[in-house]
Amino acid sequence: MGGYILKRLVSAIPVLLGITVIVFLIMAMIPGDPATAILGSYATPENVERLNRHLGLDEPLWRQYFIWLGNLMQGDFGRSFALNRPVLDEILDRFSATLILAGTAFVLCSLLGILAGVVSAARQYGLADKAITFVVILGISVPSFFLGMMMILLFAVQLRWFPVSGMYSIWGGGDLPDLIRHLTMPALALSVVATGVIARLSRGAMLEVLRQDFIRTARAKGVHERRVIWGHALRAAMVSIIPVLGIQAGFVLSGAVYIEMVFQWPGVGRMLVDGILKRDILLVQGGVVFVAACYVGFNIVVDVAQSLLDPRIRT
């Protein structure tokens, strides 16, 4: 097992290096001069030249990349131009909010998706299967940001059941019930598409397992159907379901970017959008690399969990 984990960690290195190259080149190709954006009304040619020299932006592009990469490997993400504070400090402050939102959405889509998939497979071609399939297709078809805006109009503006935006109330909020009220709509909007995908693939995995000989044997021995479904079939199907959960975790994490903008959630996604608008290069580059590293790390955990369920994967 230790060798397999080490192999997965080593394989993650070129992925992360590739991400640093891509995000660096994308930020370099964005129109506009960062120094001009930072200086604003003070952007005289002399000031722009002085700031570019101070930030190292007058160096060749390849040299800028290797300087940034070298600092990154030492844990130095640089300093935000717009916020005038270390990039890593800003990311860590924002990441807790993103983790709460994405983590809640991931738990919801995992539980609801697997439950819907199992019930749909157990009642194949029945009323429950058709109803779940209809709801799943509808959920997959609706963009999360559009669903979020519709939820705001209905549940926040019209019915006033939930707050419109933010993470806490500005008037004496900050407790757990207040957080739950603010979290409900964005977490649901973020989880809908992933729930549908997990449900569809869980249904397929369950149907494949239910056709296998050991399930027929269990039923022939008189094992209760509930135990056959939830005890034997689901356990065997989890080998195929777990990789799906890992992939959807990435989609949930990336989807948090626009959901945070719709609901004004103070997370990393909103920070990245603000950084792009302000041409805060180091903030955007550091944020993308940090989120990518979290996604890669989570997928390694998923692969290890899958290898525990199916040792053949390690070979």
Language model features by range: what are they?
Residues 19, 36-39, 63, 78-81, ...:
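Short, hydrophobic secondary-structure boundary micro-motifs
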Residues 43-44, 56-57, 74, 78, ...:
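Residue-level marker of structural boundaries
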Residues 2-4, 13, 93-128, 144, ...:
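Alpha-helical transmembrane segments of integral membrane proteins
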Residues 58-114:
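An internal, D/E-rich "acidic patch" concept
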